[in-house]
From Swiss-Prot:
Subunit structure: The complex is composed of two ATP-binding proteins (UgpC), two transmembrane proteins (UgpA and UgpE) and a solute-binding protein (UgpB).
Gene3D superfamilies linked: MetI-like
GO CC list: plasma membrane
Record has Cell inner membrane as a keyword: yes
Entry's transmembrane regions: 12-32, 81-101, 110-130, 158-178, 208-228, 263-283
Record gene name: ugpA
Subcellular location as annotated: Cell inner membrane
Protein's name in the database: sn-glycerol-3-phosphate transport system permease protein UgpA
Domain ABC transmembrane type-1: 72-284
Job of this protein: Part of the ABC transporter complex UgpBAEC involved in sn-glycerol-3-phosphate (G3P) import. Probably responsible for the translocation of the substrate across the membrane.
Residue intervals on the Cytoplasmic side: 1-11, 102-109, 179-207, 284-294
Periplasmic side: 33-80, 131-157, 229-262
Length: 294
């Protein structure tokens, strides 16, 4: 006699339970995405009161705009730097804390603190340190013979926003990496050491494959963070300058949509950014996930 399968007394109850989540998805994702897609094929006046269907004209104009193509390239470079540097530094810090026996709680607390700081505040903090006239780091660099002014030097401006963005995200990555490292059975590491594997070999051949699911998850999260959540950092630190050197796609959407009131162009840029993020996510799940060991 097989046990009875548990179920709901009312056939409509499962749909009622998922209704709030479906409503949130429809209101905050599907509806805005649909409106952006519709506006991207229209020409709207600055107040959105009149429109004219223009098809793919907005997209064609974007890819003929050298400033938009430059922001596209800037976004790719910026995202790769933020995700790559952030993940590697966070993993290194988590590995160091995992090996520390005394005072590990203190190290964990200090490394988690930046996560409580708002992105705009993090940007202001680094601006104070790198201020051309009053910054402590600027004065230290001047004594070494290096002149710093991120308001005039595009490379320095990019360095500043990458540094602030990475510093803000390190705490989030650190928490996941540390939890993954501490979940590895010590017996496996000890067995590898007994077999003659050194610390470096144990880390790359044993530890790194075991935490690959967490690494893959953080890779996706950090790319999304670099594409979207770094907007306050860029806005507070450089305002997209100098000469649009730090203008990413999300910041260009804001500048043209909210500051320039070019709703059609900003909608088309939003659609392109959405497709870009979806494409990168699909590529990661299609190819990168193959190397993940669950």
């Amino acid at each position: 006699m097989s046990p009875s399968r548990p179920g709901f007394s009312c056939s409509w109850l499962p749909y009622l339970l998922v209704l709030p989540q479906l409503a949130i998805t429809a209101i905050f994702f599907l509806w805005p995405a649909g409106e952006a897609l519709w506006y991207s094929v229209q020409t709207l006046d600055p107040f959105g009161l009149s429109s004219e269907f223009v098809g793919l004209s907005n997209f064609i104009q974007l890819f003929q705009d050298e400033y938009y193509l430059a922001s596209f390239y800037t976004t790719l470079i910026f995202s790769a730097l933020v995700a790559g540097i952030g993940l590697n530094v966070s993993l290194f810090l988590a590995a160091m804390v995992d090996y520390v026996l005394r005072g590990s709680r203190l190290y964990q607390t200090l490394l988690i603190l930046p996560y409580a700081v708002a992105p705009a505040v993090a940007a202001v903090l680094w601006i104070f340190l790198f201020d051309p006239g009053l910054g402590l780091i600027t004065h230290a660099l001047a004594k070494l013979g290096y002149s710093w002014n991120h308001a005039q030097n595009s490379g320095q401006a990019m360095f500043l926003v990458v540094l602030a963005s990475v510093w803000k995200q390190i705490s989030y990555n650190f928490l996941f990496f540390l939890a993954a490292l501490q979940s590895i059975p010590k017996s496996l590491v000890e067995a590898a050491a007994i077999d003659g594997a050194g610390p470096v070999r144990r880390f790359f051949n044993l530890v790194l494959p075991l935490i690959s699911p967490v690494s893959f998850f953080l890779l996706v999260v950090n790319l999304v963070y670099a594409f979207f959540d770094t907007f306050p950092v860029i806005d507070a630190a450089t305002g997209g300058g100098p000469v649009q050197a730090t203008t990413t796609l999300i910041y260009k959407i804001y500048r043209e949509g909210f500051a320039g009131l070019d709703l059609s162009s900003s909608a088309a840029q939003s659609v392109i950014l959405m497709l870009l993020v979806i494409g990168l996510t699909v590529i990661q799940f299609r190819f990168v996930e193959r190397k993940v060991r669950y």
